[in-house]
Every structure is written in structure tokens, then in C-alpha cells.
């Protein structure tokens, strides 16, 4: 992190804001900036936004709108990190996104935590939809065709359902508890990701897997749900037989969690899943780096890539009916 990139002094009406109610949403629309405060600030910023605008959310818990515009929405991260003075942005309801025709390109959601779902629906084709460094219970794509879309550095604590209309959809350096089935009409790539379970009764999993770590079954389902048309390169499974039905595979391995991680691990919202030294050298990806979330072109991190509000100093007294608020903004070096 670059320490204290800049500070913003904001004067707000004393009647309109309290120290304990300082969730902040900033809206950047062209050259114009607006600041909104409180639990409804995300909703208010969204209502004022135009397609392509940027909304930045501070730490805190926010009410959520139903999204129909293509925006860039960036939170402070999905993990509390008190040692570094950073706290998460929490969405307190299911986030529903239904992008309308003409508002479907280049949507970005980054750095938010939700204990419920992200649901992307609609009929319009969605291009370059990106979810980055977020945590959700379940993520579902249904109805819309997604083209060139991406999940990166995410944690999915429940189910990931990419759906039947995905074209060049990639899941990169992410951790997924359960993966739902899809059809051969979808083109999906999992790269340097950890899949803890498969939940597929009717449709087998068909995708390209590269440099991934795969667990076995989920619940009462059987073990291997990889479709024969899947492509597997430099992947490891904890279940012997996971790759048996796959026709195109190279450099596949079987091992156990203790050899790979040093202990028996399941899904976690906080574990970094670092490989043991032996596993790092023994199980190498197509790029010569370690398999799993710390390899590849974009090694795992939970720190948002954009400047974020990490400190808010609020004056205890008003001056001329105004309350002085100092906001400190920091950003990751890369």
C-alpha cells in the first residue's frame, strides 16, 4: 500500500451526518464528483449515476439498489484488516444486476463483502463483466449471455453458477466452495483457482482447467463431474478418479490436503491456502509457477487495486453550522 496518497477535507452539514453514521459513497460522473453519506448512500449515488460512472464505497454496511446501469463500483475490500487500518465494505442484501440493452458493457464490481448472493439476470448480452476481490455466498448468472467476463481474486462461499450462455468466461486465482454444472455450449476457463466441491446432478462440469486444485464431491453427489469434453492441464485433485472421464488432459496429479497445505483444509473466508515448500516445487503450472491461487499472472490478493477510503477523522464540534471531515485515501502500489 502507498501510505496516504492524499487527504480530502469535506465540509458537511452538521444536521446531516453523525460520527457513528459515516458510510460514504462518492460518485464520479465525468468531471463532477458528489459525496453521499449514511446507510443509503450507495442507493443515492446509484440513483444519481449515469452509465459508465464510478461509485466508490467506504468501509461500512450499505443498503443496495437493484442495478440496471453498467457502472464501476469499488469498495474498500471484503476482509477486515485492523493491523493495517482497513475495514470491509459490506452489502447487507442480495445484489441483483439486470443490465438493460445499451447498458451492458464493462461493468466492474470490486472490493465488497456480502453474506448473501450476487444474481446477474436479463436477456441482453453482457460484455466484459468483471467481479474482482469480492466475497459472496452464491453467484448466479442466468438468462443473459456473458461474453469475455471474469471473476478474479474472489471467494464464493456457497455456489458458483455461470450458467449455460457463457462465452470466454474466466475464473482466475479464486476460491470456490461449490461449482454448479453447465452445458457444452458454454466456454469457461478456470485458471489458478481452488474448487472445493462439485454440485452437479444433471449437467456435468465442462470447462478448461489450468493450474487448479480440485476437491471431490459436494454433499450427496458423486465424485467426478468433469465432462469428457473438459480440458485439464497441470491440475491436482484430492480424489483419485476426478480426471478419468476427461479426454484431453496433461500433467494431472493426485495428492492430499496435508501434503499440499500442511493440514486438512476446507473452504475458508480468510485462509490464504499457501502451498508447502515441497508442493510448490513438485506441482508446477503451465507457466512454470506453482499451481493454485498464488501462481499465474495475477497472484492472489484481497487488497483492492484502486484508491480507497481507509480513515475518516470527524470533528467533534461544528464551525458555522458545518462539520469538518478528513478522509484519508490509500491505494495498492500495483
Predicted features, each with a name:
Residues 25-63:
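Acidic Gly/Asp/Thr-rich repetitive segments characteristic of extracellular carbohydrate-active
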Amino acid at each position: 500500500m502507498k501510505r496516504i496518497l492524499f487527504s480530502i477535507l469535506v465540509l458537511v452539514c452538521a444536521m446531516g451526518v453523525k460520527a457513528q453514521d459515516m458510510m460514504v459513497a462518492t460518485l464520479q460522473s465525468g468531471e463532477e464528483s458528489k459525496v453521499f453519506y449514511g446507510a443509503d448512500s450507495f442507493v443515492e449515488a446509484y440513483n444519481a449515476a449515469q452509465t459508465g460512472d464510478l461509485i466508490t464505497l467506504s468501509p461500512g454496511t450499505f443498503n443496495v439498489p437493484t442495478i440496471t446501469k453498467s457502472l464501476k463500483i469499488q469498495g474498500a475490500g471484503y476482509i477486515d484488516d485492523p493491523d493495517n487500518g482497513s475495514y470491509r465494505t459490506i452489502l447487507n442484501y442480495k445484489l441483483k444486476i439486470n443490465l438493460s440493452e445499451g447498458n451492458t458493457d464493462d461493468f466492474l464490481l470490486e472490493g465488497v463483502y456480502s453474506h448473501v448472493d450476487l444474481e446477474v439476470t436479463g436477456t441482453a448480452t453482457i460484455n466484459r463483466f468483471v467481479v474482482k476481490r469480492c466475497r459472496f455466498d452464491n453467484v448466479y448468472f442466468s438468462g443473459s449471455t456473458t461474453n469475455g467476463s471474469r471473476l478474479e481474486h474472489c471467494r464464493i462461499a456457497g455456489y458458483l453458477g455461470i450458467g449455460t450462455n457463457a462465452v470466454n468466461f474466466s475464473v482466475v486465482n479464486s476460491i470456490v466452495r461449490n461449482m454448479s454444472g453447465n452445458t457444452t455450449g458454454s466456454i469457461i476457463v478456470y485458471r489458478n483457482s481452488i474448487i472445493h466441491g462439485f454440485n452437479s446432478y444433471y449437467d456435468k462440469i465442462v470447462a478448461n482447467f489450468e493450474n487448479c486444485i480440485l476437491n471431490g464431491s459436494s454433499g450427496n453427489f458423486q465424485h467426478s463431474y468433469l465432462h469428457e469434453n473438459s480440458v485439464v492441464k497441470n491440475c491436482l485433485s484430492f480424489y483419485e478418479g476426478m480426471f478419468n472421464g476427461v479426454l484431453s488432459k496433461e500433467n494431472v496429479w493426485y495428492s492430499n490436503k496435508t501434503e499440499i497445505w500442511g493440514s486438512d483444509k476446507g473452504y475458508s473466508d480468510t485462509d490464504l491456502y499457501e502451498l508447502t515448500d515441497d508442493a510448490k516445487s513438485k506441482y508446477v503450472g503451465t507457466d512454470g509457477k506453482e499451481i493454485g491461487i498464488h501462481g499465474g499472472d495475477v497472484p492472489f490478493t484481497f487488497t483492492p487495486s484502486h484508491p480507497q477510503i481507509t480513515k475518516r477523522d470527524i470533528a467533534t464540534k461544528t464551525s458555522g453550522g458545518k462539520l469538518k471531515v478528513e478522509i484519508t485515501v490509500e491505494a495498492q502500489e500495483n
